[in-house]
């Protein structure tokens, strides 16, 4: 979902900073 205009996941998923 990262890099897609309609990204369905929070930015932290792409930044790998979740949790």
Swiss-Prot record:
Keyword entries, A-Z: Acetylcholine receptor inhibiting toxin, Amidation, Disulfide bond, Hydroxylation, Ion channel impairing toxin, Neurotoxin, Postsynaptic neurotoxin, Secreted, Toxin
Presence of keyword Disulfide bond: yes
Location of this chain's protein in the cell: Secreted
Glycine amide: residues carrying this PTM: 19
Modified residues (4-hydroxyproline): 5, 11
GO molecular function, one term: toxin activity
Primary localization class, coarse: secreted
Annotated tissue distribution: Expressed by the venom duct.
SS bond partners: 1-9, 2-14, 12-18
Cellular component terms per the entry's GO annotation: extracellular region; host cell postsynaptic membrane
Family listed: Belongs to the conotoxin A superfamily.
Domain notes: The cysteine framework is IV (CC-C-C-C-C).
Job of this protein: Alpha-conotoxins act on postsynaptic membranes, they bind to the nicotinic acetylcholine receptors (nAChR) and thus inhibit them. This toxin blocks the fetal muscle subtype (alpha-1-beta-1-gamma-delta (CHRNA1-CHRNB1-CHRNG-CHRND) subunits) (IC(50)=66 nM) with 1500/2000-fold greater affinity than the adult (alpha-1-beta-1-epsilon-delta (CHRNA1-CHRNB1-CHRND-CHRNE)) subtype (IC(50)=96000 nM). It blocks the currents completely and dissociates rapidly from the fetal muscle receptor. Has no inhibitory activity on various neuronal nAChRs.
Protein name: Alpha-conotoxin OIVB
Species per Swiss-Prot/TrEMBL record: Conus obscurus (Obscure cone)
